[in-house]
Amino acid sequence: MLHIRSWTLPKSSCSTLIWNRGFSKAPVLQVAKVIAVQDKKINLDREKHIQRIQERIEKIPISNYRNFSIVAHVDHGKSTLSDRLLELTGVIQPGAANKQVLDKLDVERERGITIKAQTCTMFYHDTNTKEDYLLHLVDTPGHVDFRAEVSRSYASCGGALLLVDAAQGVQAQTVANFYLAYSMGLKLIPIINKIDLDAADIPRAMDQVETTFELNREDCIPVSAKTGLNVENIIPSIINNIPPPQGDINKPLKALLVDSWHDPYVGVVMLVHIVDGKMKKGMKLLSAHTSKKYEVKEVGVMYPDKTPMDVLRAGQVGYIIPGMKNPREALIGDTFFQNGQHENLEPLPGFEEPKPMVFVGAFPADGGEFKVMNDHMENLVLNDRSVTLEKETSNALGLGWRLGFLGSLHASVFKERLEKEYGAKIILTAPTVPYKIVYKDGTEKVITNPDEFPGADQRALNIDHLMEPYVKAIMTIPDEYIGVVMSLCENNRGIQNEMEYLNTGQVLLKYELPLAQLVEDFFGKLKGATKGYASLDYEDSGYKKSDIVKMELCVSGIPQDALSQVMHRSQVQSRGKEYVARFKEYLKSQLFEVAIQAKVNNKVVARETIKAKRKDVTQRLHAADISRRKKLLERQKEGKKQMKASGRVHINHEAYQAFLRRSD
């Protein structure tokens, strides 16, 4: 009897596992031949498919290229609209299996956000002019934490679709990304999405587009990305309004790095926009910013997955495999030249290395899993060069890491990916931001760890002042909540810059806020104050002089390094009382009295006391034996004094975990 067990692999490979239990090999060979024929047929079909795509691209002039992006607030339907456009151009088939095609990460699909920039090549045949067009959709992140990907993606585009929810109207992220796209010279096409909703108010959304962005309401295209209604009107508008790329295939190669990711089999895969010239397999590349050299192993387009091509031409957005082993060499916004033909060529403008703005300590929940967790951490960092990773040691939590992120959402996504993809359990300390120390001699130092914060004696001797980072926050709220939101901003040390009433019952508020306040769940408080109707976006606003101090949490006089925090002096009293009261909940009683103190510059600002356990040493005494009773109680009291002087409080690992978990 022949037993055959098989499973489905990707189309490029067909594999079957066969066991023959002592019988004739002839049936096995016949099955193997069938499989070989099927494999060959699949490969031939794929080669023909690739050849057809390649031939079609070759026939399209650069004047018929259109590179575009989609500007939208979170959950306004950007990924859904991308799916409809891919279906409309025949890249994918309609169906639930092809949902959020350009969101490759699980966390992107679950949260409904885009984290990594992606692209897809599409063909469109204009039935009126009988011409073919090559479209490149560059799907960008919308959140400010991933602004590096956004700006580089916009740099590869000639225009963008400005997506507005017909029910919610213009939101903060829409405004922030509009200004970024507008400042980069992109042609914007307003799209009013979700017109199928009962709450949709199309005229109101059009009014907001006209008043907020000064775009003609007549240019708005009302669509439903969910049902596909009117989506077919978008591509003709793209062709008629968005200009083609201005590249020249005959000039020396100049390519912009839009994004990159790490593939365990081929190394780094880079998403590039060919500005001038062409790129093909075997070409030697030179990085403008690292001066490192690479040899191209493969070039291709995303259709929607990697599809190898012979060449990428000026104007195209595609992928290359450069033989790069270290992902940290792939710098977003870097320019690549052909080695030997780069003399007198200037790198493309706008390159800026992403700077981490939120730092946390990370420790394994089980200290014995540090080595395994370290491997997981390094693997994840391979795919995200904007994360900084350094090992550190805590007296309280043991071995761990100091991680730097672009923002609080970035940190949250990283933690979620670590837990979901590797099953890791991790503890994050309270987030801190990069503070700046300005010394009396004019030199500066940036600190990202509370342990590096100078003591009172050091500050008095050679430090002139301290500075903290600020951000420009943009909020859109219903006008009925304006009072409570302004109070929230002022309580978080905000400085009002601008207030604009939109003509639809919405208010646009612009505040300067300390970044430290923003990462402490400011958005959660904003949502709570407005019953979920507020939206928020922000951008860097530089450093301002500030009265910053370090608060230590001490148990029996011993500082707990993992619980130290840097904050503004105005927060010390309230935060100190809150911390000592909360930490008291997780400590067990000792045989001696335990003091939990919050200290600033060695001065106690808040205190809680855990009373000592008491053993009844008089239980066997006769009621009338008063002198003996006093003697035993005095001896017990003296013993507890000695224990308090020499004893050390043992704090369970679980106490730190519980306290920090509540601080998240």
Swiss-Prot record:
Organism, as annotated: Clavispora lusitaniae (strain ATCC 42720) (Yeast)
Domain of life assignment: Eukaryota
Gene3D superfamilies, sorted: 3.30.70.240, Elongation factor 4, C-terminal domain, Elongation Factor G (Translational Gtpase), domain 3, P-loop containing nucleotide triphosphate hydrolases, Translation factors
Family designation: Belongs to the TRAFAC class translation factor GTPase superfamily. Classic translation factor GTPase family. LepA subfamily.
Cellular component GO terms, alphabetical: mitochondrial inner membrane; mitochondrial matrix
tr-type G domain ranges (all copies): 63-246
SUPFAM superfamilies: EF-G C-terminal domain-like (SSF54980), P-loop containing nucleoside triphosphate hydrolases (SSF52540), Translation proteins (SSF50447)
General function of this protein: Promotes mitochondrial protein synthesis. May act as a fidelity factor of the translation reaction, by catalyzing a one-codon backward translocation of tRNAs on improperly translocated ribosomes. Binds to mitochondrial ribosomes in a GTP-dependent manner.
Molecular function in Gene Ontology: GTP binding; GTPase activity; mitochondrial ribosome binding
Catalytic activity: GTP + H2O = GDP + phosphate + H(+)
Top EC group: hydrolase
GO biological process, any: translation
EC number: 3.6.5.-
Localisation: Mitochondrion inner membrane
Binding-site residues, GTP: 72-79, 139-143, 193-196
Keyword Nucleotide-binding: yes
Keywords from the UniProt entry: GTP-binding, Hydrolase, Membrane, Mitochondrion, Mitochondrion inner membrane, Nucleotide-binding, Protein biosynthesis
UniProt-listed Pfam families: EFG_C, GTP_EFTU, GTP_EFTU_D2, LepA_C
Protein name according to UniProt: Translation factor GUF1, mitochondrial
Gene, per the UniProt record: GUF1
Any further remark recorded for this protein: This protein may be expected to contain an N-terminal transit peptide but none has been predicted.
Membrane topology: Peripheral membrane protein
